[in-house]
Swiss-Prot record:
Its cofactor is pyridoxal 5'-phosphate. It catalyses: L-tryptophan + H2O = indole + pyruvate + NH4(+). Gene3D superfamilies: Aspartate Aminotransferase, domain 1, Type I PLP-dependent aspartate aminotransferase-like (Major domain). Pfam families: Beta_elim_lyase. Homotetramer. This is Tryptophanase. The keyword Membrane does not apply.
Length: 471
């Protein structure tokens, strides 16, 4: 198998879901009704759904079987302890709080860390800034609604689609330390390391970079939270690209990675492969006070701390999914599938970010240079792709980034990207070929695609529910 051109799907398909075909006229009407926002389309009207890989893929037979062990006790569930044991074995973290998904963890830990910094270091809430290699949208949103400014400190190669670089997700370490000094260390409530960096194109962060970032954080006594949605994909890239770790297992690399954070927050709907679930975990006793405070908030916002909004069967499934998501053959196939799609798009002249872990990212700014950033070229491209082929994708650019909450001005975005997110074990190579062919048709009509403007704009996380029209 090692010498074959393409790696086949390393699984057998046992259950299928029929999908509906639609006409171009039907799709044009549907996208207009949705306010030119693919998030608001009905799933029944989508032929290939590349909106997200979050909870949209298949599960393994071992995960499905694990659900039968679910203990639905309100408190002290046996299934909770199975999940907590998986966390200890994989990440080395001693304290676990389950949540319904990643944002459930964020709404708990962010206010707790801000309060802790205020009480212990005299944080000035009017001056507080949190740093990341690049904040995920909901992490940014929860920070902002708690009054915290966010600052992304990424390397210059990160968003240059013409550059190939092994670890485009890396922190700009000089920029990080300079930023901390600028705002004052006591006004930095937390640093978030996002692995992989979703907004940069699913790009990995090297272990060397994480070590250096953590050293800076410890110098200023700032807590580090690992945003862990795609921890296994990041470990795979480290194995492939960081020579020191080429002979390490994914499990060993993962354990090493989590030495360089104090907490982890996870949407388990990605690399842990579950339809619903999240985690908030603390490494050791030095964050026991944070754990205690977060448990209290969990009761109010998610559920009792030993279920956190999840049924017992879902916790059992997650306990297994954390392991299944680290399977080396599975990861090799998944990364190869993304690479295949990127290669196919570039062969027809569609510029992409270098292949990352979970999606192909099309450079919409280059495909639609006539549409300015404030008319959202990647969102316009998403609408055209749906009209042409019934494919739903998602904008990662100015539309998602939003406005400065203090000034109301559009935040400058480093790139206008369209994310083609591949759900796990759901679509085959034939689907990838269809997507590539769809882009041939889109490219032929690119000059006629129009920009977009708002008819309704929410103040926070606008990309989920905003409505637009063509300019």
């Amino acid at each position: 198998m090692e010498n074959f051109k393409h790696l086949p799907e390393p699984f057998r398909i046992r259950v299928i879901e029929p999908v509906k075909r639609t006409t171009r006229a039907y799709r044009e009407e549907a996208i207009i009704k949705s306010g030119m926002n693919p998030f608001l389309l009905d799933r029944e009207d989508v032929f290939i759904d590349l909106l997200t890989d979050s909870g949209t893929g298949a599960v393994t037979q071992s995960m499905q079987a694990a659900m039968m062990r679910g203990d639905e006790a309100y408190s002290g569930s046996r299934s909770y302890y199975a999940l907590a044991e998986s966390v200890k074995n994989i990440f080395g973290y001693q304290y676990t709080i389950p949540t319904h998904q990643g944002r459930g963890a964020e709404q708990i830990y962010i206010p707790v860390l801000i309060k802790k910094r205020e009480q212990e270091k005299g944080l000035d809430r009017s001056k507080m800034v949190a740093f990341s290699n690049y904040f995920f949208d909901t992490t940014q949103g929860h920070s902002q609604i708690n009054g915290c400014t966010v600052r992304n400190v990424y390397i210059k190669e990160a968003f240059d689609t013409g550059v190939r670089y092994d670890f485009k997700g890396n922190f700009d370490l000089e920029g990080l330390e300079r930023g901390i000094e600028e705002v004052g260390p006591n006004n930095v409530p937390y640093i978030v390391a996002t692995i992989t960096s979703n907004s940069a194109g699913g790009q990995p962060v090297s272990l060397a970079n994480l070590k250096a970032m953590y050293s800076i954080a410890k110098k200023y006594d700032i807590p580090v939270v690992m945003d862990s949605a795609r921890f296994a994909e990041n470990a795979y890239f480290i194995k492939q690209r960081e020579a020191e770790y080429k002979d390490w297992t994914i499990e060993q690399i993962t354990r090493e990675t989590y030495k360089y954070a104090d907490m982890l927050a996870m949407s388990a709907k990605k690399d842990a492969m579950v339809p619903m679930g999240g985690l908030l975990c603390m490494k050791d006793d030095s964050f026991f006070d944070v754990y205690t405070e977060c448990r209290t908030l969990c009761v109010v916002q998610e559920g009792f701390p030993t279920y956190g909004g999840l049924e017992g069967g879902a916790m059992e499934r997650l306990a297994v999914g954390l392991y299944d998501g680290m399977n080396l053959d599975w990861l090799a196939y998944r990364i190869a599938q993304v690479q295949y799609l990127v290669d196919g798009l570039e062969e027809i002249g569609v510029v992409c970010q270098q292949a990352g872990g979970h999606a192909a990212f099309v450079d919409a700014g280059k495909l639609l240079p006539h549409i300015p950033a404030d008319q959202f070229p990647a969102q316009a491209l998403a609408c055209e792709l749906y009209k042409v082929a019934g494919i739903r994708a998602v904008e990662i650019g100015s539309f998602l980034l939003g406005r400065d909450p203090k000034t109301g001005k559009q935040l400058p975005c480093p790139a206008e990207l369209l994310r083609l997110t591949i759900p796990r074990a759901t679509y085959t190579q034939t689907h990838m070929d269809f997507i590539i062919e769809a882009f041939k048709h889109v490219k032929e009509n690119a000059a006629n695609i129009k920009g977009l403007t708002f008819t309704y704009e929410p103040k926070v996380l606008r990309h989920f529910t905003a409505k637009l029209k063509e300019v």
